[in-house]
């Protein structure tokens, strides 16, 4: 790895407008832990669209994305891969 540190940031996805700031942080090669509960409680369909958008963005940038239980999603830069066991859901 490079001499630059990789930062870990926890964010809450409250609204579809938060997706752009999450993408900006992902472009900075941060590891992001995104709490999705507030949006899930408001509008599950909008949450699905937001997650699909983030999934496509992260994959096209060479990063990785996975669920962390029911309440969180983790996003990693290209240099960090997420181990997904056989029982993990996509």
Placement of each model-derived feature along the sequence:
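Residue-level signature of catalytic and energy-coupling elements of molecular machines
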Residues: 54
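A generic structural signal for short beta-strands and their flanking turns/coil linkers
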Residues: 7, 28-32, 71
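Short hinge/gating elements
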Residues: 34-41
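Ordered, soluble secondary-structure elements with a strong preference for glycine-centered loop motifs
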Residues: 12-16, 41-48
């Amino acid at each position: 790895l490079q001499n630059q540190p990789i930062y870990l940031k926890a964010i809450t996805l409250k609204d579809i407008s938060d997706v752009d700031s999450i993408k900006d942080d992902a472009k900075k090669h941060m590891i992001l832990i995104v709490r999705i509960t507030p949006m899930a409680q408001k509008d599950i369909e909008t949450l699905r669209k937001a997650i699909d958008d983030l999934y496509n963005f992260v994959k096209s940038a060479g990063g990785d994305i996975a669920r962390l239980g029911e309440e969180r999603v983790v996003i990693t830069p290209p240099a960090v891969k997420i181990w997904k066991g056989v029982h993990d859901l996509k």
